[in-house]
Amino acid sequence: MENKVIIQGEVIEVTMLKETGRMLDIFGVKIRKAEDGTEVTVECEASELDKRLLPGTKIAVLGYHTDKDEDGNPADRIVAKTLNY
């Protein structure tokens, strides 16, 4: 099941989740949400990132919430389609 989400807030940290050696690397962007202060990690491809994405950067993410990983196994993930900062 997939649900569209919009997350606005401040970047806390950026970490690599899956390394492929190409621009298809998967990164996790931990964000403190502006609406309630909770923290959420959003997955995105390396091609969506650039050097300006540092801790403290204001960000808005358009993505989707899914309950499956890439192999179809159960997982709670938020995957970014678009990052604006």
Where do the model's predicted regions map?
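Hydrophobic beta-strand signal
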Residues: 6, 60-62
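Exposed loop/turn and edge beta-strand positions of beta-sandwich/beta-sheet ligand-binding modules
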Residues: 5, 25, 38, 74
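OB-fold/S1-family single-stranded nucleic acid-binding modules
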Residues: 64-85
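Beta-strand/loop nucleic-acid-binding surfaces
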Residues: 36-53
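Short, glycine/small-residue-enriched coil/turn segments at secondary-structure junctions
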Residues: 1-8, 12
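Conserved positions in beta-strands of structured domains
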Residues: 12-15, 66
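Short aromatic-glycine-enriched beta-strand elements
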Residues: 17-31
